[in-house]
Amino acid sequence: MRVSSRHRQWLSGIALPLFAGAVVLAACAPSKSDPPVMLTIAQLQDPNSCLPCHADAFREWAGSMHAYASEDPVFVAMNKRMQRETNGQAGTLCVGCHAPLAVRLGKTKDGLNLAELPAAMKGVTCFFCHATDAVEGTHNNPLRLATDGIMRGGITDPVKAPHRAAYSSLHDRESHDSATMCGACHDVVTLPGAHVERTFDEWNASLYAKPGQLACGKCHMDGRDGQAAAVAGAPVRRVHDHSMPAVDIALTPFSGADAQRAGIQKLLDATLLTKLCVKQAATGVVAEVTLDNAFAGHKFPSGAAQDRRAWLELVAYRGGAQVFASGVVADKQAVTSIVDPNLWVLRDKTFDAADKETHLFWQAARVESELLSAAATADPQDPAFFHSVTRTFALPLPAPDRVTMRVRMRPLDFDLLDDLVSTQDLDPGVLDRVPTYELGGSNREWTNAGGFRCVE
Protein backbone atom coordinates (compact mmCIF):
# COMPACT_ATOMS: atom_id res chain seq x y z
CA MET A 1 0.00 0.00 0.00
CA ARG A 2 1.28 3.48 -0.86
CA VAL A 3 1.69 6.00 1.92
CA SER A 4 1.84 9.76 1.74
CA SER A 5 5.24 11.43 1.52
CA ARG A 6 4.65 13.00 4.88
CA HIS A 7 4.07 9.62 6.49
CA ARG A 8 7.09 8.08 4.88
CA GLN A 9 8.82 10.73 6.98
CA TRP A 10 6.83 9.90 10.10
CA LEU A 11 7.51 6.19 9.80
CA SER A 12 11.23 6.40 9.13
CA GLY A 13 13.66 6.79 11.99
CA ILE A 14 16.16 8.32 9.58
CA ALA A 15 13.78 11.27 9.13
CA LEU A 16 15.14 12.50 12.44
CA PRO A 17 17.91 15.02 12.15
CA LEU A 18 21.06 12.93 12.59
CA PHE A 19 22.17 14.53 15.84
CA ALA A 20 18.73 14.53 17.43
CA GLY A 21 18.20 10.92 16.42
CA ALA A 22 21.47 9.86 18.00
CA VAL A 23 20.57 11.67 21.22
CA VAL A 24 17.17 10.00 21.49
CA LEU A 25 18.43 6.54 20.63
CA ALA A 26 21.19 6.81 23.19
CA ALA A 27 18.77 8.07 25.81
CA CYS A 28 16.42 5.14 25.32
CA ALA A 29 18.84 2.52 26.55
CA PRO A 30 20.84 3.84 29.51
CA SER A 31 21.61 1.79 32.55
CA LYS A 32 19.31 2.32 35.52
CA SER A 33 21.96 4.50 37.16
CA ASP A 34 22.77 6.67 34.14
CA PRO A 35 21.18 10.12 34.03
CA PRO A 36 18.92 10.35 30.97
CA VAL A 37 19.86 12.60 28.08
CA MET A 38 17.15 15.24 28.14
CA LEU A 39 15.36 16.36 25.00
CA THR A 40 14.79 20.03 24.34
CA ILE A 41 11.30 21.50 23.94
CA ALA A 42 11.92 21.80 20.20
CA GLN A 43 12.84 18.12 20.00
CA LEU A 44 9.79 17.11 22.04
CA GLN A 45 7.57 19.03 19.63
CA ASP A 46 8.69 16.78 16.77
CA PRO A 47 6.81 13.44 16.81
CA ASN A 48 9.84 11.74 15.27
CA SER A 49 11.63 12.25 18.58
CA CYS A 50 9.04 9.97 20.20
CA LEU A 51 9.61 7.05 17.82
CA PRO A 52 12.78 5.46 19.30
CA CYS A 53 11.32 5.04 22.79
CA HIS A 54 7.60 4.80 21.99
CA ALA A 55 7.59 2.84 18.73
CA ASP A 56 4.20 1.17 19.14
CA ALA A 57 2.37 4.31 20.23
CA PHE A 58 4.11 6.29 17.49
CA ARG A 59 3.12 3.89 14.71
CA GLU A 60 -0.46 3.73 15.96
CA TRP A 61 -0.68 7.52 16.13
CA ALA A 62 1.00 7.91 12.72
CA GLY A 63 -1.89 6.00 11.14
CA SER A 64 -4.56 7.83 13.12
CA MET A 65 -6.98 10.54 12.11
CA HIS A 66 -5.23 12.76 14.66
CA ALA A 67 -2.02 12.56 12.64
CA TYR A 68 -4.06 13.00 9.44
CA ALA A 69 -6.14 15.90 10.74
CA SER A 70 -4.50 18.69 8.75
CA GLU A 71 -3.85 16.53 5.67
CA ASP A 72 -7.48 15.49 5.24
CA PRO A 73 -8.55 16.91 1.85
CA VAL A 74 -12.09 17.65 3.06
CA PHE A 75 -10.71 19.67 5.98
CA VAL A 76 -8.39 21.52 3.58
CA ALA A 77 -11.26 22.20 1.16
CA MET A 78 -13.73 23.33 3.81
CA ASN A 79 -11.19 25.52 5.56
CA LYS A 80 -10.21 27.17 2.27
CA ARG A 81 -13.82 27.85 1.39
CA MET A 82 -14.67 29.01 4.91
CA GLN A 83 -11.80 31.51 4.96
CA ARG A 84 -12.83 32.79 1.53
CA GLU A 85 -16.51 33.14 2.36
CA THR A 86 -15.91 34.77 5.75
CA ASN A 87 -13.10 37.03 4.51
CA GLY A 88 -10.84 35.38 7.06
CA GLN A 89 -13.12 36.15 10.01
CA ALA A 90 -13.37 32.44 10.87
CA GLY A 91 -9.69 32.51 11.82
CA THR A 92 -8.61 29.38 13.67
CA LEU A 93 -12.07 27.83 14.00
CA CYS A 94 -10.95 24.71 12.08
CA VAL A 95 -7.18 24.73 12.27
CA GLY A 96 -7.24 25.30 16.02
CA CYS A 97 -8.14 21.62 16.37
CA HIS A 98 -6.70 20.22 13.12
CA ALA A 99 -3.18 21.65 13.59
CA PRO A 100 -3.24 23.05 17.13
CA LEU A 101 0.50 23.21 17.77
CA ALA A 102 1.01 25.28 14.61
CA VAL A 103 -1.60 27.72 15.90
CA ARG A 104 -0.13 27.94 19.40
CA LEU A 105 3.37 28.56 18.03
CA GLY A 106 2.13 31.23 15.65
CA LYS A 107 2.97 29.24 12.53
CA THR A 108 -0.52 29.72 11.07
CA LYS A 109 -3.45 32.03 11.66
CA ASP A 110 -5.96 30.43 9.32
CA GLY A 111 -4.59 27.07 8.17
CA LEU A 112 -4.13 28.22 4.58
CA ASN A 113 -0.35 27.76 4.73
CA LEU A 114 -0.22 24.29 6.28
CA ALA A 115 1.33 22.74 3.17
CA GLU A 116 4.36 24.99 3.68
CA LEU A 117 4.93 23.96 7.31
CA PRO A 118 7.17 21.15 8.55
CA ALA A 119 5.49 17.85 9.36
CA ALA A 120 5.97 18.42 13.10
CA MET A 121 3.49 21.31 12.92
CA LYS A 122 0.74 19.30 11.23
CA GLY A 123 -2.09 17.31 12.73
CA VAL A 124 -2.70 16.69 16.41
CA THR A 125 0.78 15.84 17.62
CA CYS A 126 2.19 13.86 20.55
CA PHE A 127 3.50 17.03 22.17
CA PHE A 128 0.23 18.90 21.92
CA CYS A 129 -1.69 16.27 23.85
CA HIS A 130 1.02 15.27 26.31
CA ALA A 131 2.04 18.83 27.20
CA THR A 132 -1.54 19.78 28.07
CA ASP A 133 -1.90 20.57 31.75
CA ALA A 134 -5.37 22.13 31.97
CA VAL A 135 -8.71 22.41 30.17
CA GLU A 136 -9.97 25.97 30.32
CA GLY A 137 -13.32 25.63 28.56
CA THR A 138 -15.69 23.19 26.89
CA HIS A 139 -15.32 23.64 23.13
CA ASN A 140 -13.14 24.89 20.24
CA ASN A 141 -9.91 23.72 21.89
CA PRO A 142 -9.43 25.54 25.19
CA LEU A 143 -6.47 23.33 26.19
CA ARG A 144 -3.59 24.95 28.04
CA LEU A 145 -0.06 23.86 27.14
CA ALA A 146 2.68 23.73 29.74
CA THR A 147 6.15 24.96 28.80
CA ASP A 148 8.03 23.04 31.49
CA GLY A 149 9.18 20.14 29.28
CA ILE A 150 7.15 17.63 31.28
CA MET A 151 5.33 15.04 29.20
CA ARG A 152 2.14 14.08 30.97
CA GLY A 153 0.45 10.70 30.80
CA GLY A 154 -1.69 8.20 32.64
CA ILE A 155 1.21 6.41 34.39
CA THR A 156 1.56 7.17 38.08
CA ASP A 157 5.20 6.07 38.40
CA PRO A 158 7.04 6.88 35.15
CA VAL A 159 10.62 5.64 34.83
CA LYS A 160 13.65 7.74 33.87
CA ALA A 161 13.34 8.89 30.29
CA PRO A 162 14.77 11.45 27.85
CA HIS A 163 12.19 13.92 29.16
CA ARG A 164 10.59 14.73 32.47
CA ALA A 165 7.33 12.88 32.98
CA ALA A 166 4.38 13.16 35.34
CA TYR A 167 0.98 11.60 35.95
CA SER A 168 -2.05 13.56 34.79
CA SER A 169 -5.67 12.57 35.25
CA LEU A 170 -6.36 14.33 31.94
CA HIS A 171 -4.36 11.58 30.24
CA ASP A 172 -5.66 8.64 32.28
CA ARG A 173 -8.43 6.86 30.43
CA GLU A 174 -9.64 5.46 33.75
CA SER A 175 -10.36 9.01 34.92
CA HIS A 176 -13.38 11.02 33.83
CA ASP A 177 -11.07 14.05 33.67
CA SER A 178 -9.67 12.58 30.47
CA ALA A 179 -13.02 13.09 28.74
CA THR A 180 -12.75 16.84 29.27
CA MET A 181 -9.49 16.80 27.35
CA CYS A 182 -11.04 14.91 24.43
CA GLY A 183 -14.10 17.12 24.59
CA ALA A 184 -12.04 20.26 24.16
CA CYS A 185 -11.94 19.61 20.41
CA HIS A 186 -14.85 17.22 20.09
CA ASP A 187 -17.34 19.98 20.90
CA VAL A 188 -17.52 22.81 18.35
CA VAL A 189 -19.52 26.04 18.47
CA THR A 190 -19.72 28.24 15.37
CA LEU A 191 -19.25 32.01 15.28
CA PRO A 192 -23.06 32.49 15.02
CA GLY A 193 -23.39 30.31 18.13
CA ALA A 194 -24.60 26.94 16.86
CA HIS A 195 -23.36 23.91 18.81
CA VAL A 196 -22.62 21.87 15.68
CA GLU A 197 -20.45 19.16 17.25
CA ARG A 198 -21.56 17.91 20.65
CA THR A 199 -19.82 14.59 21.29
CA PHE A 200 -18.50 15.62 24.72
CA ASP A 201 -21.81 17.24 25.65
CA GLU A 202 -23.63 14.06 24.63
CA TRP A 203 -21.27 11.90 26.69
CA ASN A 204 -21.70 14.22 29.67
CA ALA A 205 -25.47 13.68 29.56
CA SER A 206 -25.16 9.90 29.24
CA LEU A 207 -24.87 6.96 31.59
CA TYR A 208 -21.18 6.75 30.74
CA ALA A 209 -20.37 10.03 32.48
CA LYS A 210 -21.66 8.73 35.81
CA PRO A 211 -19.20 7.60 38.52
CA GLY A 212 -17.68 4.23 37.76
CA GLN A 213 -18.61 4.35 34.09
CA LEU A 214 -16.51 4.92 30.97
CA ALA A 215 -14.55 7.87 29.62
CA CYS A 216 -13.75 8.28 25.90
CA GLY A 217 -10.49 6.34 25.98
CA LYS A 218 -12.13 3.16 27.27
CA CYS A 219 -13.75 2.69 23.86
CA HIS A 220 -11.46 4.62 21.52
CA MET A 221 -8.07 3.65 23.04
CA ASP A 222 -8.15 -0.09 23.74
CA GLY A 223 -5.90 -1.28 26.55
CA ARG A 224 -3.25 -4.00 26.42
CA ASP A 225 -0.28 -5.12 28.48
CA GLY A 226 3.08 -3.84 27.30
CA GLN A 227 5.94 -1.44 27.91
CA ALA A 228 5.05 2.22 27.66
CA ALA A 229 8.64 3.06 26.68
CA ALA A 230 11.72 1.16 25.52
CA VAL A 231 13.91 2.40 28.36
CA ALA A 232 15.85 0.53 31.01
CA GLY A 233 13.68 -0.56 33.90
CA ALA A 234 10.36 0.03 32.14
CA PRO A 235 7.92 -2.56 33.50
CA VAL A 236 5.08 -4.28 31.69
CA ARG A 237 1.94 -2.36 32.51
CA ARG A 238 -1.40 -1.37 31.00
CA VAL A 239 -0.87 0.76 27.91
CA HIS A 240 -3.38 1.87 25.32
CA ASP A 241 -3.83 2.13 21.57
CA HIS A 242 -3.06 5.50 20.00
CA SER A 243 -4.83 4.82 16.68
CA MET A 244 -8.07 6.12 18.26
CA PRO A 245 -10.61 4.91 15.66
CA ALA A 246 -14.06 6.48 15.40
CA VAL A 247 -15.84 6.80 12.01
CA ASP A 248 -13.62 9.04 9.86
CA ILE A 249 -10.96 7.51 7.64
CA ALA A 250 -8.17 8.79 5.41
CA LEU A 251 -9.40 9.76 1.94
CA THR A 252 -5.93 9.87 0.39
CA PRO A 253 -3.15 7.23 0.53
CA PHE A 254 -2.07 7.09 4.15
CA SER A 255 -0.19 4.79 6.48
CA GLY A 256 -2.31 2.42 8.58
CA ALA A 257 -5.54 2.95 6.63
CA ASP A 258 -6.46 -0.76 6.66
CA ALA A 259 -5.99 -1.00 10.42
CA GLN A 260 -7.99 2.19 10.87
CA ARG A 261 -10.86 0.78 8.80
CA ALA A 262 -10.85 -2.44 10.83
CA GLY A 263 -10.96 -0.47 14.07
CA ILE A 264 -13.89 1.59 12.81
CA GLN A 265 -15.81 -1.50 11.77
CA LYS A 266 -15.23 -3.13 15.15
CA LEU A 267 -16.76 -0.12 16.91
CA LEU A 268 -19.70 0.19 14.51
CA ASP A 269 -20.57 -3.49 14.73
CA ALA A 270 -20.90 -3.15 18.51
CA THR A 271 -22.91 0.09 18.60
CA LEU A 272 -26.60 -0.68 17.97
CA LEU A 273 -29.15 -3.25 19.04
CA THR A 274 -31.84 -3.72 16.43
CA LYS A 275 -35.18 -5.50 16.18
CA LEU A 276 -37.38 -6.27 13.18
CA CYS A 277 -41.01 -7.25 13.79
CA VAL A 278 -43.39 -8.19 10.99
CA LYS A 279 -46.98 -8.06 12.22
CA GLN A 280 -50.57 -8.27 11.14
CA ALA A 281 -52.12 -4.92 12.04
CA ALA A 282 -55.66 -3.60 11.63
CA THR A 283 -54.55 -1.73 8.53
CA GLY A 284 -52.60 -4.62 7.01
CA VAL A 285 -49.12 -6.06 7.36
CA VAL A 286 -46.47 -3.80 8.90
CA ALA A 287 -42.78 -3.93 9.69
CA GLU A 288 -41.75 -2.40 12.98
CA VAL A 289 -38.06 -1.51 13.18
CA THR A 290 -36.39 -0.64 16.48
CA LEU A 291 -32.96 0.98 16.71
CA ASP A 292 -31.28 1.18 20.10
CA ASN A 293 -28.01 3.05 20.57
CA ALA A 294 -27.07 0.64 23.31
CA PHE A 295 -23.31 0.92 23.48
CA ALA A 296 -21.97 4.23 22.13
CA GLY A 297 -21.06 6.69 24.87
CA HIS A 298 -22.65 9.51 22.88
CA LYS A 299 -25.42 9.91 20.34
CA PHE A 300 -25.33 8.01 17.06
CA PRO A 301 -24.04 9.29 14.79
CA SER A 302 -21.99 11.93 16.55
CA GLY A 303 -19.43 14.60 15.75
CA ALA A 304 -19.98 16.45 12.47
CA ALA A 305 -23.50 15.02 12.29
CA GLN A 306 -24.61 17.69 9.83
CA ASP A 307 -22.31 15.98 7.31
CA ARG A 308 -22.68 12.37 8.47
CA ARG A 309 -25.50 10.08 7.39
CA ALA A 310 -26.72 6.88 9.01
CA TRP A 311 -29.85 5.32 7.61
CA LEU A 312 -32.10 2.27 7.58
CA GLU A 313 -32.31 0.05 4.53
CA LEU A 314 -35.51 -2.02 4.64
CA VAL A 315 -36.49 -4.36 1.79
CA ALA A 316 -39.44 -6.77 1.46
CA TYR A 317 -39.74 -9.64 -1.03
CA ARG A 318 -42.47 -11.94 -2.29
CA GLY A 319 -41.57 -14.96 -4.38
CA GLY A 320 -38.06 -13.59 -4.86
CA ALA A 321 -39.31 -10.26 -6.25
CA GLN A 322 -38.80 -6.99 -4.40
CA VAL A 323 -42.17 -5.51 -3.37
CA PHE A 324 -41.05 -2.76 -0.96
CA ALA A 325 -37.83 -0.84 -0.47
CA SER A 326 -36.71 2.09 1.62
CA GLY A 327 -33.22 3.48 2.10
CA VAL A 328 -31.69 1.79 -0.95
CA VAL A 329 -28.93 4.23 -1.89
CA ALA A 330 -26.53 3.87 -4.80
CA ASP A 331 -22.78 4.35 -4.53
CA LYS A 332 -21.78 8.05 -4.56
CA GLN A 333 -25.44 9.09 -4.31
CA ALA A 334 -26.36 11.53 -1.55
CA VAL A 335 -28.77 9.85 0.85
CA THR A 336 -31.06 12.87 1.03
CA SER A 337 -31.30 13.03 -2.78
CA ILE A 338 -33.41 9.89 -3.10
CA VAL A 339 -37.19 10.15 -3.40
CA ASP A 340 -38.34 7.99 -0.52
CA PRO A 341 -41.27 8.96 1.73
CA ASN A 342 -40.30 6.22 4.20
CA LEU A 343 -36.62 7.16 4.49
CA TRP A 344 -35.27 6.95 8.05
CA VAL A 345 -32.04 8.89 8.18
CA LEU A 346 -30.10 9.86 11.29
CA ARG A 347 -28.43 13.26 10.95
CA ASP A 348 -28.35 16.89 12.03
CA LYS A 349 -29.69 19.75 9.94
CA THR A 350 -28.06 23.16 10.27
CA PHE A 351 -29.66 26.51 9.46
CA ASP A 352 -28.07 29.89 8.85
CA ALA A 353 -29.09 33.24 10.33
CA ALA A 354 -31.83 33.58 7.70
CA ASP A 355 -33.14 30.15 8.76
CA LYS A 356 -32.14 28.57 5.46
CA GLU A 357 -30.77 25.05 5.63
CA THR A 358 -27.03 24.89 4.97
CA HIS A 359 -24.40 22.17 5.07
CA LEU A 360 -21.60 24.72 5.45
CA PHE A 361 -21.17 24.49 9.19
CA TRP A 362 -19.57 27.92 9.68
CA GLN A 363 -22.86 29.47 8.54
CA ALA A 364 -24.86 27.53 11.12
CA ALA A 365 -26.89 29.57 13.60
CA ARG A 366 -29.06 26.71 14.85
CA VAL A 367 -29.26 22.92 14.68
CA GLU A 368 -32.14 20.47 14.33
CA SER A 369 -31.11 17.01 15.41
CA GLU A 370 -32.43 13.55 14.69
CA LEU A 371 -29.91 11.20 16.25
CA LEU A 372 -30.17 8.13 18.45
CA SER A 373 -29.64 9.06 22.09
CA ALA A 374 -27.09 7.31 24.27
CA ALA A 375 -28.09 5.32 27.33
CA ALA A 376 -28.87 7.73 30.17
CA THR A 377 -29.35 5.36 33.10
CA ALA A 378 -28.96 1.73 34.11
CA ASP A 379 -32.08 1.89 36.29
CA PRO A 380 -35.01 0.16 34.53
CA GLN A 381 -37.40 2.03 36.85
CA ASP A 382 -36.23 5.34 35.41
CA PRO A 383 -38.32 6.45 32.39
CA ALA A 384 -35.07 7.52 30.69
CA PHE A 385 -33.96 3.87 30.66
CA PHE A 386 -35.96 3.29 27.48
CA HIS A 387 -34.29 5.32 24.76
CA SER A 388 -34.69 3.15 21.68
CA VAL A 389 -36.70 4.42 18.71
CA THR A 390 -39.27 2.39 16.76
CA ARG A 391 -40.76 3.20 13.38
CA THR A 392 -43.56 1.40 11.56
CA PHE A 393 -43.62 0.75 7.81
CA ALA A 394 -46.74 -0.39 5.94
CA LEU A 395 -45.97 -3.36 3.68
CA PRO A 396 -47.95 -4.19 0.53
CA LEU A 397 -50.50 -7.00 0.37
CA PRO A 398 -50.44 -9.88 -0.07
CA ALA A 399 -47.91 -10.19 2.72
CA PRO A 400 -44.24 -10.55 1.80
CA ASP A 401 -42.47 -13.80 2.56
CA ARG A 402 -39.12 -12.22 3.44
CA VAL A 403 -38.06 -8.86 4.92
CA THR A 404 -34.47 -7.71 5.48
CA MET A 405 -32.98 -4.70 7.22
CA ARG A 406 -29.57 -3.20 7.86
CA VAL A 407 -28.16 0.14 9.01
CA ARG A 408 -25.63 1.86 6.78
CA MET A 409 -23.47 4.91 7.43
CA ARG A 410 -21.20 7.41 5.73
CA PRO A 411 -18.81 9.63 7.70
CA LEU A 412 -19.42 12.32 5.06
CA ASP A 413 -22.09 12.37 2.39
CA PHE A 414 -22.07 13.51 -1.18
CA ASP A 415 -24.31 16.57 -0.91
CA LEU A 416 -21.45 18.31 0.93
CA LEU A 417 -18.69 16.71 -1.14
CA ASP A 418 -20.32 17.42 -4.50
CA ASP A 419 -20.73 21.05 -3.45
CA LEU A 420 -17.03 21.32 -2.56
CA VAL A 421 -16.13 19.81 -5.92
CA SER A 422 -18.42 22.28 -7.71
CA THR A 423 -16.53 25.22 -6.20
CA GLN A 424 -13.20 23.60 -7.15
CA ASP A 425 -12.16 23.36 -3.51
CA LEU A 426 -12.04 19.54 -3.53
CA ASP A 427 -10.45 17.14 -6.01
CA PRO A 428 -13.27 14.98 -7.44
CA GLY A 429 -10.99 11.94 -7.18
CA VAL A 430 -11.49 12.03 -3.41
CA LEU A 431 -15.13 11.01 -3.83
CA ASP A 432 -14.12 7.52 -4.94
CA ARG A 433 -12.57 6.85 -1.54
CA VAL A 434 -15.53 7.84 0.65
CA PRO A 435 -16.70 4.68 2.44
CA THR A 436 -20.21 3.44 3.07
CA TYR A 437 -20.17 1.35 6.23
CA GLU A 438 -22.59 -1.38 7.16
CA LEU A 439 -23.19 -1.91 10.87
CA GLY A 440 -22.75 -5.66 11.10
CA GLY A 441 -24.80 -6.00 14.26
CA SER A 442 -27.80 -4.32 12.62
CA ASN A 443 -28.65 -6.99 10.04
CA ARG A 444 -31.98 -8.73 10.57
CA GLU A 445 -34.03 -11.05 8.34
CA TRP A 446 -37.62 -12.17 8.81
CA THR A 447 -39.23 -14.98 6.82
CA ASN A 448 -42.81 -16.19 6.90
CA ALA A 449 -41.68 -19.69 7.81
CA GLY A 450 -42.12 -18.84 11.48
CA GLY A 451 -45.19 -16.65 11.09
CA PHE A 452 -45.58 -13.07 12.25
CA ARG A 453 -42.97 -12.41 14.93
CA CYS A 454 -39.94 -10.34 15.93
CA VAL A 455 -36.33 -11.03 15.00
CA GLU A 456 -33.59 -9.56 17.18
Language model region names:
Residues P100-T108:
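Conserved, well-structured interaction surfaces
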Residues A29-S31:
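Bacterial signal peptide processing site
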Residues S33-I41, A57-E85, T108-A399, T404-E456:
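Primarily the internal scaffold of c-type cytochrome electron-transfer domains
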Residues L25-A27:
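C-terminal motif of bacterial Sec signal peptides marking the signal peptidase cleavage site
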Residues G91:
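Aromatic-lined, polymer-binding surfaces characteristic
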Residues V95-P100, H130:
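Outer-membrane beta-barrel channel domains
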Residues R2-L18:
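Bacterial N-terminal signal peptides that target proteins for export
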